[in-house]
Regions:
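Conserved, well-ordered alpha-helix/loop/beta-strand core segments that scaffold catalytic motifs
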Residues: 43, 48-76
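Alpha-amylase-like alpha-glycosidases and glucanotransferases acting on alpha-linked glucans and related
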Residues: 1-51, 76-173
Length: 173
């Protein structure tokens, strides 16, 4: 559904979509599912082809003794199906706008710090169901690769929060 709506919206980020679908109102979801049924089938088919082909490639590589290493970023993009589908898992306000975003503090490498702009997780919310979103994410990644590296793993034990809308990372904490 996400990609079908995104295509119909001219590839605009989901947080710029019409309010009803941006906020995932049940009546809007139903309407868009019906309106985009053919496109949804297309995206399902394309994903099926990818996973079939990737599975064959991985099997061939493994048979030849080659292990595939994957790299999963600690944070997901704001403009992603993950954030749109599960906004309660991210530090967003009542309008689904980030309150704080990810980055790194200023240091010798960068006097302004690094402003990545990804929405931060609501770990307290994720803990309520045993971090099932994370477990599903890792499990899905591990079906594609033999070894998975989490990029900026340190983000699991601490993070740097920057007020949303800031031009640099200087005001983070």
């Amino acid at each position: 559904l996400y990609m079908a709506v995104k295509a119909k919206m001219g590839l605009k980020p989901w947080n710029e979509w019409d309010e009803e679908i941006r906020m995932r109102r049940p009546e809007a979801l139903k309407k868009w599912r019906a309106q985009c049924a053919e496109d949804i089938s297309y995206y399902i088919f394309v994903q099926y082809l990818f996973f079939e082909q990737w599975g064959k490639l991985k099997k061939y590589a493994n048979k030849k003794g080659v292990k595939i290493i994957g790299d999963a970023p600690i944070y997901v993009a704001m403009d992603s199906a993950d954030v749109w589908a599960r906004p309660e898992l991210f530090q967003l306000d009542e309008n689904n706008v980030p309150t704080e975003v990810a980055g790194c503090p200023p240091d010798a490498f960068s006097e302004d710090g690094q402003l990545w702009g990804n929405p931060l997780y609501r770990w307290d919310e994720m803990a309520k169901d045993g971090f099932s979103w994370w477990l599903k994410r890792l499990k899905a990644n591990l079906t594609l690769v033999d070894v998975l590296r989490i990029d900026h793993f340190r983000g699991l034990e601490s993070y740097y929060a920057i007020p949303y809308g800031d031009a640099t990372a200087k005001n983070g904490r």
